[in-house]
Amino acid sequence: MKVRNVDNNFVAAIGKSGIYPFRLNICLYFADGFLIDAGSAFILKKIKNFLSDKKVDCVGITHVHEDHTGAAAWIKEHYNVPVYLHEASIEEAAVKSSIPLYRFLTWKNRKGFAADPMPEFIETEKYRFDVINSPGHHPHHVVFHEKNKGWLFTGDLYIGRRQAVAFKDENISDSINTIERLLTLDFDTIFCGHSGIIKNGKEKFREKLEIFLHLRDRVNALQSEGLSFEEIDKRLFPDKNIWELISRGEWSTLNMVKTV
């Protein structure tokens, strides 16, 4: 994993997960004993190496998807520390994941683990991270805000300014509402679960919001003409994204159209 020093006792680690052509970036953030997200089981050995010289005090997981929880069971067993997760996802986390082949080739299945209910904030000696519910990519997604530093750890809420497809659990209207709330916060830097460290984060979120709102306007206009969601999808997205084909519709433009 590539490791980058961000601040005093705060490092970011980026690793590649999956086999070709499914390889994608995964980012972990370790700040003063607090680990944000637990990567995928595919890179478990790399995560173990990354943490080998670190004292982990607790883990905060942005959401229960397998690319953010892959090392959670090992961390819980090895360090015996709290692994915090949205309370509504604790039952799901306790059971080993069962995922389609394309996701297995990218992330692998994670073991079940005993998660701890997410507190309102997580405080270390140097930092305080406020926990903010942020539904959109997942209904039980959270972000972590270190307001004194202007940092926002966004899990899978941001990824990039323009979104090509939406996951089956995703709700774009929820993402819009969440982004509008987050834009009232004081932050400059986004720490994304896959795209890494992004400066001018508030402006990037504004751009993403505008793109979503423009899509909503287009969908509403076509609905007013009597088009169905499927017809609107074909009109707005005539060429299918490769991930839509590989995932057999788990990721789709249609879900963007339906939920915006």
Feature map (PLM): residue ranges:
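Active-site neighborhood of phospho(di)ester-bond hydrolases with catalytic His/Asp-centered motifs
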Residues: 36-39, 57-65, 83-87, 133-136, ...
